[in-house]
């Protein structure tokens, strides 16, 4: 070898060694996202300050061993930094992931941000350029995303238009991009859940079950290449065609009618949990579609695998076992809520279990090895649809007096569930689950057309729920008993005894998830815009932070970098508050302030003088609630529930004149308002406008009659926020 060249190589090697040795950030910046299976498994003991996966680690207990912020120091907590990564036209539902001092977080349109976890300074962002027209597929409002996965140097995100993307954790550059949609006879869908990554694979499901012709499945992709490793379907397809795998032949025996023409639902839109001890992936399966089983599966049975927890082998994709929480789902009672893995003493021995509080109101403790049901006790008194779970059969006993097919009525829980996706926190030492739930009733009835003709037609675009809508629904409600009162609670629940160590009422019916810590604290962002910190011993509030937005349907987590513990949550805006999409991070002695935005008053502008007929308004009522309400809200929805798309009652004359260009022509598609040219005709659009104008006139009349009370409430709100 040339001597000079050898000396040069040697000199450069020493120089590189010097740089790496005395500049720790050098290695970190070139090795971001270094998350492996072994690291995640060991993280509870070796790095409790990290938050490496959606649920903190593979067990997804979301319980932190950090103690710097505790019952003695909580009064020193303050806002450390903020970062606006979205706006009020999206929902911020993601859980930040923190790896080696970098926070990875997503906004509603699936944009990934890598931030310095101590300052909020942006390192990079990746925009997947989601097709904004995908908003038409959403069941539940504007664009939202529950977070990313970080694994082996990559960041993975499921996009709102149905793709799975891998991004280089160092640079933010795209590595691969795959479309998760199977086009054969199935409609497109959204992805809103966070992917999970483990055992060399990335796992993702999908949502949009209510949009018609949707059939749930989970796909495992090779983490390096994006190639499909296996796919597990959750609802059987056409029995006249070959089944994709043996489990579908089993499932098809439990369905009736021509379910495959509807799709069936069963999407895995949220919870996927990897268990390295049993080499399994637990899938939380969603509701049936349409909702009423009399429409979806007449003469059927359990309709597997709707509303179930399914365990599959991560190597083969074949099923180990399943447990169905709501056989023959009839109420939109998904089992897609978060699951936690734990260990409990049961029958004198330690059992490895999966724990879940799904929508239906019962809390389930299931053996992870074989799917044996160990406990199924109610976590709420607000259960009408069933009396109890029979432990001999493992099945809920449906209440014979609560049959909405023959008698439309209010039923608890509502389709939103007693507990929805908002994260829980499991203290494995104490055997307590901390979570928020609410008792809310919804009015259930069959679709008017189905009642009259026995036929139900799936909408190609818009929601296909199968229940009564519009004027028909309102007429039934007027004839029914009054709606039961709603109430929300947060508590510490013992799933073995079925009792609460403590439980407290909440001011808002809609709130965020929780995280508990070994410091004796429970952090809970509430729908009122308050981050409440409670004593885990008794649930008493020790500290509150009042934000200018709302924490409805969001999450919270905690992490440590260096010698400082942090708490992070996501703030949403709404129609009344022109602010949203903001990460809020707190630490001891944090001293920054978040600016208070101006409250936007909902004043009805000058209205068109069109004269619409009763029939046209009624048609518009049905069309509006089928095509518009999931984003713009049902008429009368209050601002505090964070429906953030514009209130159409407040359209000015110019917008009325441009409505055809907007809705049919797609002139605002880039702003998130898709075109409906293939769904809504010009005459139907005019009927929708007729309904909106009629509702705007009613609102304007109400405002004029109650002006003094409205001004007083606005002044009080301003004082509370000052």
Language model segments and positions:
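Extracytoplasmic beta-rich repeat domains
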Residues: 83-95, 125-149, 174-194, 233-271, ...
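C-terminal capping alpha-helices of c-type cytochrome domains
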Residues: 158, 616, 657, 677-717
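Blade-level signature of beta-propeller repeat domains, shared across WD40, Kelch, NHL, RCC1
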Residues: 557-602
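Repeat-blade elements of multi-bladed beta-propeller folds
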Residues: 51-55, 91-111, 137-163, 188-211, ...
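Sequence/structural segment immediately N-terminal to covalent heme-attachment motifs in c-type
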Residues: 614-635, 657-665, 720-722
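Electrostatic cytochrome c docking/interface patches
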Residues: 38, 599-623, 718-722
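Gly/Gly-Pro-rich "capping" loops immediately C-terminal to redox-active cysteine motifs
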Residues: 633-668, 675
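Blade/loop signatures of beta-propeller domains
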Residues: 29-79, 238-248, 395-400, 478-480, ...
């Amino acid at each position: 070898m040339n001597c000079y060249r050898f000396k040069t190589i040697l000199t450069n090697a020493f120089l590189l060694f010097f740089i790496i040795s005395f500049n720790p950030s050098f290695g970190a910046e070139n090795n971001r996202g270094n998350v492996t299976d072994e690291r995640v498994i060991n993280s509870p003991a070796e790095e409790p300050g990290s938050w490496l996966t959606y649920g903190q680690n593979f067990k997804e207990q979301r319980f932190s061993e950090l103690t710097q912020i505790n019952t003695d120091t909580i009064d020193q907590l303050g806002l450390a930094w903020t970062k606006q990564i979205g706006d009020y036209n999206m929902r911020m539902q993601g859980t930040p992931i923190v790896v080696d001092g970098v926070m990875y977080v997503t906004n509603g349109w699936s944009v990934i941000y890598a931030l310095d976890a101590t300052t909020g300074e942006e390192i990079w962002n990746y925009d997947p350029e989601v097709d904004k027209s995908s908003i038409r597929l959403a069941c539940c409002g504007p664009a939202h995303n529950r977070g990313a996965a970080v694994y082996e140097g990559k960041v993975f995100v499921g996009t709102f238009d149905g793709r799975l993307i891998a991004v280089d954790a160092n640079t933010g550059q795209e590595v691969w991009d795959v479309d998760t949609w199977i086009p054969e006879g199935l409609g497109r869908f959204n992805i809103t859940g966070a992917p999970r990554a483990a055992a060399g694979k990335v796992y993702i499901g999908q949502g949009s079950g209510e949009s018609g012709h949707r059939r749930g499945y989970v796909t495992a992709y090779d983490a390096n290449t994006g190639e499909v490793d296996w796919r597990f379907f959750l609802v059987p397809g056409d029995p006249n065609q070959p089944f994709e795998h043996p489990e579908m032949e089993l499932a098809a025996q439990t369905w009736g009618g021509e379910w495959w023409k509807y799709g069936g639902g069963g999407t895995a839109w949220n919870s996927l949990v990897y268990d390295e001890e049993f080499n399994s992936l637990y899938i939380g399966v969603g509701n049936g579609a349409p909702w009423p089983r009399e429409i979806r599966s007449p003469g059927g049975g359990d309709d597997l695998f709707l509303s179930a927890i399914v365990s599959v082998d991560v190597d083969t994709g074949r099923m180990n076992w399943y447990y169905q929480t709501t056989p023959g789902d009839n109420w939109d009672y998904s089992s897609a809520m978060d699951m936690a893995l734990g260990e409990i003493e049961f029958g004198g021995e330690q059992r490895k279990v999966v724990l879940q509080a799904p929508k239906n109101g019962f809390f389930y403790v299931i053996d992870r090895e074989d799917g044996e049901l160990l406990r199924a006790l109610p976590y709420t008194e607000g259960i009408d649809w069933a009396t109890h779970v029979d432990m001999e059969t493992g099945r809920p006993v449906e209440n014979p007096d609560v049959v909405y097919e023959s008698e439309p009525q209010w039923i608890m829980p509502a389709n939103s569930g007693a507990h929805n996706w908002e994260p829980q926190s499991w203290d494995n030492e104490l055997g307590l689950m901390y979570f928020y739930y609410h008792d809310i009733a919804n009015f259930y009835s069959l679709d008017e057309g189905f009642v009259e003709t026995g036929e139900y037609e799936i909408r190609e675009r818009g929601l296909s729920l199968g229940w009564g809508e519009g004027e028909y629904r309102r007429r039934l409600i007027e004839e029914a008993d009054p709606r039961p009162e709603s109430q929300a609670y947060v508590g510490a629940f013992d799933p073995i005894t079925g009792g609460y160590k403590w439980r407290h009422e909440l001011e808002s019916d809609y709130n965020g998830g929780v995280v508990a810590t070994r410091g004796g604290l429970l952090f809970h962002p509430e729908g009122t815009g308050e981050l409440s910190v409670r004593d885990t011993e008794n649930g008493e509030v020790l500290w509150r932070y009042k934000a200018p937005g709302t924490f409805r349907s969001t999450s919270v987590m905690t992490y440590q970098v260096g010698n400082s513990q942090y708490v992070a949550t996501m703030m949403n805006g709404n129609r009344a508050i022109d602010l949203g999409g903001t990460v809020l991070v707190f630490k001891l002695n944090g001293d920054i302030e978040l600016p208070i935005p101006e409250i936007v008053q909902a004043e009805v502008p000058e209205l068109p003088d069109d004269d619409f007929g009763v029939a046209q308004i009624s048609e518009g009522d049905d069309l509006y609630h089928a095509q518009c309400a999931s984003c713009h809200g049902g008429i009368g929805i209050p601002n505090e529930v964070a429906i953030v798309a514009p209130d159409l009652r407040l359209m000015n004359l110019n917008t009325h004149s441009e409505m055809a260009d907007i809705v049919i022509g797609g002139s605002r598609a880039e702003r998130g308002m898709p075109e409906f040219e293939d769904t809504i005709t010009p005459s139907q659009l005019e009927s929708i406008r007729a309904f909106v104008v009629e509702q705007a006139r009613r609102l304007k009349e109400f405002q004029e009659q109650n002006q003094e009370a409205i001004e007083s409430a606005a002044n009080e709100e301003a004082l509370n926020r000052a």
